Amino acid sequence: MTSIEPTHTGKKVIVGMSGGVDSSVSAYLLMQQGYQVEGLFMKNWEEDDNDEYCAAAEDLKDAQAVCDKLGIKLHTVNFAAEYWDNVFEYFLAEYKAGRTPNPDIMCNKEIKFKAFLEFADDILDADYIAMGHYVRRRDNEDGTTQMLRGVDNNKDQSYFLYTLSHEQVARSLFPVGELEKHEVREIAKQMGLITHDKKDSTGICFIGERKFTEFLGNYLPAQPGNIETADGEVIGTHQGLMYHTLGQRKGLGIGGMKNSNDDPWYVVDKDLKRNVLVVGQGGHHPRLMSNGMLVNQLHWVDRKGPINGSQIVVKTRYRQQDIPCTLTYLDDNTLKVVFDEPVAAVTPGQSAVFYDGEVCLGGGIIDQLIRG
């Protein structure tokens, strides 16, 4: 399909300014394209006064410096209540149920592209919003808008944005999605932006780089239990199943076991009923492999999902190689996905995101694994 460009002149864009390099360059590029640009900084977590992990004040300072340099307004908004209700409580409930959620995906759905868009609409009278995500949008002549992978394969963030609606994608601009990361940093450097060499943020969306076990333990009581081999031999103890995920190799504290080979130990299963962490040696241990999965809570960006029997590709985690697969609908909200080859460490609670070439079709939540 042929792509068409939106008319830029006079259109007002509210850019989500995070205090990082990607949003900084996004604002600059949109100004170059003729948009009327303003920034909006979101505060989504109420940190303690002595909180060493949250850098919200520093990020706001950097965002303000960038906006001052570009000569644009910076607005601020507090979405902490919305974040707690719609993202953090979901995050805790999933961990409590023994699954491994992805809060960044929920944050994009509920905060960055919902609460933010509503605020930009109602208060700031925006035509578009923009974020520093590495994805692209394509406006087609038939009136549809598609979300595409970012040009930089290593930074592509479409996996985190699959829950966006067609309408949200149509109202959003992603300037850095057309660029490689090194190009973004070079533009920021050339423009003298303070964020040009600022490191990328990591950790839980908006909560920062806390020690995860310590942070989670503040909200959910830990339940220590045994670590067993796949054969049922007790070889250690864990502090709580919620601290572990399938395929995990580090932090198990069970190296140098007698009668074991030199292969590293991996988490291969979590027995919720017995509160037992099951481990096995080798990254392709049979208990770690799946032939497929059941995926529910389906969402398709353009409202129409792939047809029954489609042979496409899926990612079950960020930055994973594409996995060829075949889809079968069990009902309107459940997909049976069969992989062409067995896949390691597919994790219930995580998202499965489907692609047709460069187009991100949508996805759902991994509910059950198909083994054997």
Swiss-Prot record:
Region (Interaction with tRNA), start-end ranges: 155-157, 317-318
InterPro entries assigned: MnmA-like, MnmA-like_C, MnmA-like_central, MnmA-like_central_sf, Rossmann-like_a/b/a_fold
Main location as per UniProt: cytoplasm
Compartment(s) where it occurs, according to its Swiss-Prot or TrEMBL record: Cytoplasm
Domain of life: Bacteria
Keywords, alphabetical: ATP-binding, Cytoplasm, Disulfide bond, Nucleotide-binding, RNA-binding, Transferase, tRNA processing, tRNA-binding
Reaction catalysis annotation: S-sulfanyl-L-cysteinyl-[protein] + uridine(34) in tRNA + AH2 + ATP = 2-thiouridine(34) in tRNA + L-cysteinyl-[protein] + A + AMP + diphosphate + H(+)
Region Interaction with target base in tRNA, residue ranges: 102-104
Site keyed Interaction with tRNA: positions: 133, 350
Record GO terms (molecular function): ATP binding; tRNA binding; tRNA-uridine 2-sulfurtransferase activity
Keyword match RNA-binding: yes
Disulfide bond keyword on record: yes
EC number: 2.8.1.13
GO biological process, one term: tRNA wobble position uridine thiolation
Disulfide-bond pairs as recorded: 107-205
Catalytic residues (UniProt): 107, 205
Alphabetical list of SUPFAM superfamilies matching this protein: Adenine nucleotide alpha hydrolases-like
Residues involved in ATP binding: 16-23, 42, 132
Enzyme's top EC category: transferase
GO cellular component, one term: cytoplasm
CDD domains to which the protein is assigned, alphabetical: MnmA_TRMU-like
Main function: Catalyzes the 2-thiolation of uridine at the wobble position (U34) of tRNA, leading to the formation of s(2)U34.
Similarity comment text for this entry: Belongs to the MnmA/TRMU family.
Protein name: tRNA-specific 2-thiouridylase MnmA
High-level lineage: Bacteria, Pseudomonadati, Pseudomonadota, Gammaproteobacteria, Alteromonadales
